[in-house]
Curated annotation (Swiss-Prot):
This is Large ribosomal subunit protein bL25. Belongs to the bacterial ribosomal protein bL25 family. Keywords: Ribonucleoprotein, Ribosomal protein, RNA-binding, rRNA-binding. Pfam families: Ribosomal_L25p (PF01386). It comes from Buchnera aphidicola subsp. Acyrthosiphon pisum (strain APS). One of its GO terms (biological process) is translation. InterPro entries: Rbsml_bL25/Gln-tRNA_synth_N, Ribosomal_bL25/Gln-tRNA_synth, Ribosomal_bL25_short, Ribosomal_L25_dom, Ribosomal_uL5_bac-type. One of its GO terms (molecular function) is 5S rRNA binding. The keyword Ribosomal protein applies. This is one of the proteins that binds to the 5S RNA in the ribosome where it forms part of the central protuberance. GO terms for cellular component: cytosolic large ribosomal subunit.
């Protein structure tokens, strides 16, 4: 099982996302049925290297957010149209 480190965030919006991307990070969200959504910040290079593996899309991932661990699955990925950059990832809780 692949492991991914994340931080929580409180801000939303285009301006905040742009500031994150300048610092080589990008926004993500973790959500599920009857669960509260968690807004996340991921490191771009680490995530980009992990997403090159087929297991990133087919298997469950272990998402470590501060001191909690969640079993998640990738729901959606937004990529830049011509640069090799990730813009946003949606994660789904796995029971």
């Amino acid at each position: 099982m692949l492991t991914l480190q994340a931080e929580t965030r409180k801000e939303k919006g285009t301006g905040f996302s742009r500031r994150l991307r300048i610092h080589n990070k990008f926004p993500a969200v973790l959500y599920g049925v009857k669960k509260t959504e968690i807004l996340l910040i991921l490191d771009h290079n680490t995530t980009f290297n992990l997403q090159k593996k087929i297991e990133f899309y087919k298997e469950n991932l272990l998402l470590c957010v501060q001191d909690k661990k969640y079993k998640v699955k990738v729901q959606a990925i937004q990529r830049h149209s011509f640069k090799s950059k990730l813009l946003h990832i949606d994660f789904l809780y796995v029971e």
